[in-house]
Amino acid sequence: MSVDLATVKRVAKLARIALPEDEAERVMGELNGILGFVEQLSEVNVDGVEPMTSVMPMAMRKRKDAVTDGGKADDIVANAPETDRHFFLVPKVVE
């Protein structure tokens, strides 16, 4: 697969990137190089290879889910001019 100049210009327009004509030629070459590398990767035989998310085998530490108020209610309303039981009080706007 390769991209032509029209495709490069269309992608630049969709991405809202100003792309001068001389830059479009260079970008076309770079994109074709990237696509060539991706095609090489698709030729690699990965039969029997386990999918992985990291090169280092790691297990996430899990904690028990617990619902809390975060312990920050006093800090959150500390600078509010008026509060009532950790709720902000604001002037009535709609009649």
UniProtKB/Swiss-Prot annotation:
Gene Ontology biological process terms, A to Z: glutaminyl-tRNAGln biosynthesis via transamidation; regulation of translational fidelity; translation
Intrachain disulfide bonds: none
Coiled-coil ranges (or none): none
Family matches, as InterPro entries: Asp/Glu-ADT_sf_sub_c, GatC
EC number annotated for this UniProt entry: 6.3.5.-
Reactions catalysed, as given in the entry: L-glutamyl-tRNA(Gln) + L-glutamine + ATP + H2O = L-glutaminyl-tRNA(Gln) + L-glutamate + ADP + phosphate + H(+); L-aspartyl-tRNA(Asn) + L-glutamine + ATP + H2O = L-asparaginyl-tRNA(Asn) + L-glutamate + ADP + phosphate + 2 H(+)
GO molecular function term, any single one: glutaminyl-tRNA synthase (glutamine-hydrolyzing) activity
Keywords from the UniProt entry: ATP-binding, Ligase, Nucleotide-binding, Protein biosynthesis
Enzyme class (EC, first level): ligase
HAMAP family documented for this protein: GatC
Assigned protein family: Belongs to the GatC family.
Function: Allows the formation of correctly charged Asn-tRNA(Asn) or Gln-tRNA(Gln) through the transamidation of misacylated Asp-tRNA(Asn) or Glu-tRNA(Gln) in organisms which lack either or both of asparaginyl-tRNA or glutaminyl-tRNA synthetases. The reaction takes place in the presence of glutamine and ATP through an activated phospho-Asp-tRNA(Asn) or phospho-Glu-tRNA(Gln).
Quaternary context: Heterotrimer of A, B and C subunits.
Official protein name in the record: Aspartyl/glutamyl-tRNA(Asn/Gln) amidotransferase subunit C
Organism: Allorhizobium ampelinum (strain ATCC BAA-846 / DSM 112012 / S4)
High-level lineage: Bacteria, Pseudomonadati, Pseudomonadota, Alphaproteobacteria, Hyphomicrobiales
Gene this chain is encoded by: gatC
